[in-house]
Amino acid sequence: VQFLGVLLLATITIGLPVYWLYEPERQANATEGFENRFASWGSQLFDVTANGGFNCAGCHGGMNATGGAAEYTVTDSKTGQVKAVSWKAPALNTVFYRFSEDEVRFILEYGRPFSPMSPWGVRGGGPMNDQQINNLIYYLKSIQVPRENCIVADADPLNCDGGHLPASVQDDIQAAAERSVDDGTYSSIGEALFNLELGSGAYSCARCHTPGWSWGEPGETGAGAFGWNLTGGATNSHFATEQEMIDFIKAGSVYGAKYGVQGQGSGRMPGFGSTLTDDQIREIVNYVRSEL
């Protein structure tokens, strides 16, 4: 009996520390396993209808969500005329550069009114429960463009804090803007970036702030659509200085948080500080404040 007691004591004394030594790794591996499974289930939901999915891929540019188009009908508010259009569906492989997880969840649950983006969560009247929305979010996280210069050097570049688009992608954005100036489409880099079509408008301002831009029939630039009207010096009234406006565009709006002059965030305005360079944002601000 004494021997068994000593053996048990030795097992506890030696075994438990050894067990706890490996416990953090075990938990980390278990968490990674759950996340991978959730992402896999999310991919099935994201897939095209023919494969049993909800056709997110069909609109947003395939399983990597690089940007696509959705068939939609729009009604002219003045004439009542109805017509079919092809609506630019933005790339989602940078969506977490622009929005927080809570903001992405809100968009998935409630959709974007007056656009092809329907509500998908049961809270918004859609077909997906909370777990399915979570699975979609895990899948979207798994296809993000890897970030450069994360705050923590060895963090997962798909979902790390801080960081920005790879320099090569930012160079592509700049090159696309410069081409549209060189060919005479736009008169300045700021105007070109404001209207940038790369990624089906994922990096542009006009997608939300110019009526009709999303289906190729833009009205007055910056006159307001899903985003508010920027014309007539509106931004100069809302932001006392150029730097205030730059800081707002970099961070985006935060639900309930104040910004500018008597502004309160809705969470709908994405942050562009991780996708565009400081110089690119400054070009946009100069264009909006001086030309709209």
Locate predicted features.
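Sequence context surrounding c-type heme c attachment/ligation sites in exported
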Residues: 40-57, 99, 191-206, 216-219, ...
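Inter-heme linker and motif-flanking segments adjacent to c-type heme-binding CXXCH motifs
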Residues: 65-69, 125, 142-152, 185-192, ...
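Extracytoplasmic/periplasmic mature domains of Sec-exported, cell-envelope-associated bacterial proteins
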Residues: 37, 52-53, 63, 70-73, ...
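Extracytoplasmic electron-transfer domains, predominantly the class I c-type cytochrome c fold
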Residues: 73-143, 217-292
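Electrostatic cytochrome c docking/interface patches
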Residues: 22-50, 67, 157-201
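Hydrophobic membrane-insertion alpha-helices, especially the h-region
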Residues: 3-19
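Surface-exposed patches in mature extracellular/periplasmic domains of secreted proteins
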Residues: 54-58, 119-120, 146-155, 203-207
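The canonical Cys-X-X-Cys-His
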Residues: 42, 51-63, 104, 136, ...
